[in-house]
């Protein structure tokens, strides 16, 4: 929601400390990852990382140069990631399209079953 608003406002710089990683965790449908996903703590960490990566890919597809940064010492908080995106008007259309393709591929990989969750994630990329 926050990133969608930042995109709608055409923000030049976006700094986000992401939360709300539960959506992918509840919808994960990827048999290749069952060996990891059967352990709830590892499943959550996998979904956290995948969600943040997809958020960065989505921002890249809108013309932003993106990075995931360590926010503070990991001993202070379990989720210490900050997503940084800086709009780059010089980013080529081809680079934006590649980022969009990578975003869609990630959604389809993690959410195999055709359903509401996959459509929700894909709609964010449009």
Model-derived segments and spans:
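Class I S-adenosyl-L-methionine
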Residues: 1-126
């Amino acid at each position: 929601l926050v990133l969608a608003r930042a995109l709608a406002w055409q923000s030049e710089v976006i700094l986000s400390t992401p939360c709300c990683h539960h959506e992918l965790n509840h919808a994960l449908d990827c048999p290749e990852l069952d060996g990891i996903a059967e352990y709830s703590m590892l499943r959550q960490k996998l979904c956290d990382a995948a969600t943040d990566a997809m958020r960065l890919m989505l921002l890249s597809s809108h013309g932003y140069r993106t990075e995931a940064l360590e926010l503070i010492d990991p001993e202070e908080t379990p989720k210490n990631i900050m997503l940084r995106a800086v709009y780059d008007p010089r980013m080529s259309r081809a680079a934006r399209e590649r980022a969009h393709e990578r975003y869609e591929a990630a959604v389809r990989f993690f959410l195999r079953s055709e359903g509401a969750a996959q459509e929700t994630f894909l709609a964010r990329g449009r």
